[in-house]
């Protein structure tokens, strides 16, 4: 029977992580469980840096961006000996289960702990919206608003100077954030990992727009697709139009979470406690068609596929 749980945030921070921690803590305390917060993700778990959390520990946290527990990259956690130390630290503290809030790398850590016999629940916390088994991740909608606001501002200056603007959006190898922001921001061109990209084809489309009288344009592109400064130089050379690239970078991860992210994080945090009390370990939480769901974390990582919103892409093309 579970009496004490641990909670940590791992990987890149996302708006709503604090709300998720709050959801976990308050739901657990309501059920009579103790909660230990683990500082700086798996690194803090390995180094045994933990603190007892109560209701006041998470007061005024629901509206705060980032994660008050901190986060860190810790690739050494792939080492089974490192994980064995982490599990020993958990057991030494009397912790019976662990809630992990983070992206796919964080899920991989939870999967490996699960395979070693320690029950974990994964909550999807990443702006990339690239986690399998869920329609949306904690932080995605806040980041979407941030990106759209940036696109709106870029459009103001691009139209003033009849310029082509390239905006690089986070997402790692998932184009969800780019695609949604491009549609909401009225971008003329969208470049995402899920669709084959050829810069000559992009230039041809831009030239076609210019021939129709288009004075400016915005190209939204997912990070890691190419060097955006080189792409800007190529477009300017081929079209004769001034072209500038803007990398939004880590500003996309910051800021107070929007209401939907706060609600999603709170629901998922409380649901994680429900699952643990029902005897479920080794699960990851998602939301599908606005219903909370859970999947086997090993199966989710190894076998599940995340569909690309191809219908959204087709819609976007009609709006160019």
Curated annotation (Swiss-Prot):
Homotetramer. Keywords: Allosteric enzyme, ATP-binding, Cytoplasm, Glycolysis, Kinase, Magnesium, Metal-binding, Nucleotide-binding, Transferase. The gene is pfkA. ATP binds at residues 12, 73-74, 103-106. HAMAP family: Phosphofructokinase_I_B1. One of its GO terms (molecular function) is metal ion binding. It comes from Salmonella arizonae (strain ATCC BAA-731 / CDC346-86 / RSK2980). Its cofactor is Mg(2+). This is ATP-dependent 6-phosphofructokinase. The lineage of its organism: Bacteria, Pseudomonadati, Pseudomonadota, Gammaproteobacteria, Enterobacterales. Substrate binds at residues 126-128, 163, 170-172, 223, 244, 250-253. Its EC number is 2.7.1.11. GO terms for cellular component: 6-phosphofructokinase complex.
